[in-house]
């Protein structure tokens, strides 16, 4: 808004702040930091001061530089925007969709559920040719298939072989050896003994107890069995 909006033109000696609502946030059009603070404070009015109090276009600050949304999400998944497109099964969330989102700094999940492994492999070929191997982040869907364990185990082995770092896990009612294997295979010991988990799992859950299960450490007996198997 121009500083003179809704008021008579002020003399040059009158401070600009006196023309704004008393509880409004002020930001000059050429001050990125002030614009960021003002725009993110959505509960208060924002008055943008133009040069000389005149009307004109205000330069929009790119969303990425505003830092809007979850900073933790962006840091956790290495993306520029806190935006995530979930997996739509049978390739509806296609390789092209994953690539388009990834190149724009968003996280997208390949809809691998319901696809044979050779089609998932072909999709990974296309995605990693565009986004790189273990470079620009993307996810792949893994659906729990109790009637056909080979689908789940084959998917996990493929993801480990191809260095897929994010899996979107669907329809899991419990933690299985295969989803635990994917997670623990990416564990490393970092500086100062800190545990680093390269492989991340996004659980799609429908009940709070399933969310709690996903947040717990993996069952010790499953981990022990996996270690025994090498």
Protein language model annotation of sequence segments:
Residues 6-230:
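Active-site entrance/lid segments in N-terminal catalytic domains of soluble metabolic enzymes
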């Amino acid at each position: 808004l121009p500083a003179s909006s809704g008021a008579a033109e002020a003399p040059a000696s009158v401070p600009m702040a006196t023309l704004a609502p008393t509880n409004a946030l002020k930001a000059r059009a050429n001050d990125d930091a002030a614009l960021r603070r003002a725009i993110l404070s959505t509960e208060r009015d924002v008055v943008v001061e133009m040069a000389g109090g005149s009307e004109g276009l205000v330069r929009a600050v790119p969303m990425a530089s505003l830092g809007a949304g979850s900073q933790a999400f962006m840091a956790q998944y290495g993306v520029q925007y806190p935006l995530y497109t979930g997996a739509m099964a049978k390739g509806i969330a296609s390789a092209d969709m994953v690539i388009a989102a990834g190149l724009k700094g968003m996280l997208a999940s390949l809809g691998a559920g319901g696809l044979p492994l050779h089609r998932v492999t072909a999709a990974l070929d296309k995605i990693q040719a565009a986004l790189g191997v273990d470079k620009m982040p993307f996810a792949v869907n893994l659906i729990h298939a109790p009637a056909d364990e080979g689908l789940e185990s084959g998917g996990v082995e493929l993801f480990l072989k191809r260095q897929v770092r994010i899996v979107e896990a669907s329809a899991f009612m419990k933690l299985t050896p295969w989803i635990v294997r994917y997670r623990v295979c990416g564990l490393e010991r970092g500086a100062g003994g800190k545990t680093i988990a390269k492989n991340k799992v996004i659980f799609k859950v429908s009940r709070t107890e399933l969310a709690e299960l996903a947040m717990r450490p993996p069952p010790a007996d499953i981990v022990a069995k996996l270690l025994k198997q090498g």
